[in-house]
Amino acid sequence: MRKKIVVGNWKMNKTIAEAVELSSAIIDQLGEVSASCEVGIAPAFPALSGVHGVISGTGIHLAAQNCHYEDDGAFTGEVSVRMLDEAGCSYVIVGHSERRQYFGDTNPVVNLKVKKALSAGLNVILCVGETLDEREKGITTEVVTCQVKEGLEGVADIGDIVIAYEPVWAIGTGKTASSLQAQEVHASIRATVAGLYSEPAAAGVRIQYGGSVKPSNAEELFAMPDIDGGLIGGASLNAEDFVAIVKAAEKS
């Protein structure tokens, strides 16, 4: 039985003080973290230290939203995995569609980041997903399969990787893939992992859904056999909504 995982991606939202306040509210409303579901939050880089101080010892994981593939150097504005490790991160999100769209994170760049993060002992949330144009052309499976294969190129062990399927057309738009649409892609991703590694590895890898997950649709999504939790954007900025989604995952 795969353990569900729900991670809140706060993106470029919340000041340090606001992030500390939100993480405290999540702890207060969530109570003890259930053994049936991992929980993580990914604040913006400046808030990592403050949030880590709040969630340390609660069982909630600290995640980063991105990393660079070099240890150090002249890369203005970037953050290394060693810095993230020292800040208390246990997870890092790699290949989010907004990174791919706005910052030129190609599949080969994503692959370099995946391998660098793993080398530092971080768990990776590898994001994949198709655009609306790609879905309408009927090439969702081909696009996502390519992203998975190229993102995992040269990665010998998938044990420390979570895959997040995030249809780009459903991120921040209010649109959501139906539970059956999401399940179809998740099953395809699991089959791809089986081909790259093994059936046991595929059976064990957790695949999150990300794309306008809300308290109203979380339970239905998480009931699907290949959906193992969520990478939550907008709803994670509200403690009550985020905790409701976590509770839905715990029950599924």
Curated annotation (Swiss-Prot):
It comes from the Bacteria. The keyword Isomerase applies. One of its GO terms (biological process) is glycolytic process. InterPro entries: Aldolase_TIM, TIM_sf, TrioseP_Isoase_bac/euk, Triosephosphate_isomerase, Triosephosphate_isomerase_AS. Its EC number is 5.3.1.1. Pathway: Carbohydrate biosynthesis; gluconeogenesis; Carbohydrate degradation; glycolysis; D-glyceraldehyde 3-phosphate from glycerone phosphate: step 1/1. One of its GO terms (molecular function) is triose-phosphate isomerase activity. PROSITE patterns: TIM_1, TIM_2. The active site is at H96, E166. GO terms for cellular component: cytosol. It is found in: Cytoplasm. Keywords: Cytoplasm, Gluconeogenesis, Glycolysis, Isomerase. It catalyses: D-glyceraldehyde 3-phosphate = dihydroxyacetone phosphate. Substrate binds at N9, W10, K11, G172, S212, G233, G234. Homodimer. PANTHER family: TRIOSEPHOSPHATE ISOMERASE. Involved in the gluconeogenesis. Catalyzes stereospecifically the conversion of dihydroxyacetone phosphate (DHAP) to D-glyceraldehyde-3-phosphate (G3P). Belongs to the triosephosphate isomerase family. This is Triosephosphate isomerase. It comes from Prosthecochloris aestuarii (strain DSM 271 / SK 413). The lineage of its organism: Bacteria, Pseudomonadati, Chlorobiota, Chlorobiia, Chlorobiales.
